[in-house]
Amino acid sequence: MRQILEDSQLRRAMQLGVILIVGSCLISQLMMQLGGGARDERVDLTGQAPEGFEDEGFIFEDGFPPFISSAGAFMPERIVFNFGLFTGGVLMILLSFEVFHRTKPEGTKRNVANVTALITGVIIGFSMVQLVGHPFNTSLIMHIFWA
């Protein structure tokens, strides 16, 4: 089996991915909750709602809801949120390929599982990258799709 990273490097890369994603979500959410200002003003996203769904909870009277994605709306927390999710998503894609190459099995059943794990890892990593490109306050439907 071909491997790019040593075992200790792979372990550190996986730890880094978890720290990046979880840490950036927690820090950016804390920044958003304490930021005040426009974050606490009424948010109306009905202009982005699909036709016929305009009355389905797209208005937040008390400001941005405490969703993880709310942290991607305003600076400076947006920088933390975007950096963590984008970098974590790219790292997840790369680690998916590393694990795929390390675990290439001989049997057909295990090969299907290995390919499935690779595909899902790449999709999840790509989805995290796309969340950065589609903030929920400006691109709601695409954000929901990628989330």
Model regions and ranges:
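Early transmembrane hairpin module of multi-pass membrane proteins
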Residues: 2, 10, 14-147
